[in-house]
From Swiss-Prot:
Name this protein carries in UniProt: Pyridoxine/pyridoxamine 5'-phosphate oxidase 2
Species annotation: Arabidopsis thaliana
Key words, A-Z: Flavoprotein, FMN, Oxidoreductase, Pyridoxine biosynthesis
Functional description taken from the UniProt entry: Catalyzes the oxidation of either pyridoxine 5'-phosphate (PNP) or pyridoxamine 5'-phosphate (PMP) into pyridoxal 5'-phosphate (PLP). Has an in vitro catalytic efficiency for PNP approximately 300-fold lower than that of PPOX1.
Species lineage: Eukaryota, Viridiplantae, Streptophyta, Embryophyta, Tracheophyta
A Pfam family recorded for this sequence: Pyridox_oxase_2
Protein family membership: Belongs to the pyridoxamine 5'-phosphate oxidase family.
GO biological process, one term: pyridoxal 5'-phosphate salvage
Cofactor dependency: FMN
The keyword Flavoprotein is assigned to this record: yes
Family matches, as Gene3D superfamilies: Electron Transport, Fmn-binding Protein, Chain A (2.30.110.10)
Disulfide-bonded cysteines: none
Length: 198
């Protein structure tokens, strides 16, 4: 029998709280499938959960390679290790990309809210030259500016990871739990959990 409440979220909130004194505790690895079929991985910042949802929010640049990869294949896995408590969360699911061209007004408002939740310094990276492009001396000496009250620039994207499977490992207690979601007959998400060998 499953539950509508994601049982792994309490474990994750506990790990976030217990490791909050570590500046790196909000950094997670996000893997996608490259256009060449090979793994592609990078570190991103956890920006919280979508309101009243299990969906994980991540900010990114529309010009980054991961956007093209996610448009080709929206499946992804996040790996999050908490070094003080020795806990690992592998969160597998589908990512929705919300950019300026999204036709849904509610999603555009969500994107704007996420934009303003970031510091001005974080927002400035979206007006810098294209990530991964060759660097020239003129670009590196230019000062980038952004009006703090202006809304999201076109390069800013909000990613929403919809968890489908969560693999939790606690190395201190030698405990491993596997959570998986499925849709009920009414279309609601339901979670099941299973204790497995570490």
């Amino acid at each position: 029998m499953g539950t509508h409440v994601a049982p792994w979220k309490q474990l994750l909130f506990g790990a976030i709280e217990a490791n909050s004194h570590l500046s790196h505790s909000s950094y997670v690895q996000l893997a996608t499938i490259g256009l060449n079929g090979r793994p592609s991985n990078r570190t991103v910042v956890f920006r919280g959960f979508e309101e009243n949802s299990d969906r994980i929010q991540i900010n990114t640049d529309l010009r980054s390679r991961k956007i093209e990869e996610l448009k080709h294949c929206p499946f992804s896995e996040m790996c999050w290790y908490f070094s003080d408590t020795w806990e690992q969360f592998r969160i597998n699911g589908r990512i929705e990309v919300i950019d300026a061209s999204n036709p849904d007004q509610t999603k555009l408002q969500q994107r704007e809210k996420a934009w303003f939740a970031n510091s001005l310094r974080s927002r400035l990276i979206y007006v810098c030259p294209t990530p991964g492009s060759p660097c020239n001396s003129e670009q590196s000496s230019q000062q980038v500016k952004l009006d703090p009250s202006s809304g999201p620039v076109p390069e800013y994207c909000l990613l929403l990871l919809e968890p489908e499977k969560v693999d939790y490992l606690n190395l201190k207690t030698n405990q491993r739990l596997f959570f998986s979601s499925m849709a009920t007959g009414t279309g609601e998400k339901c979670w099941t959990s299973e204790k497995v060998n570490p």
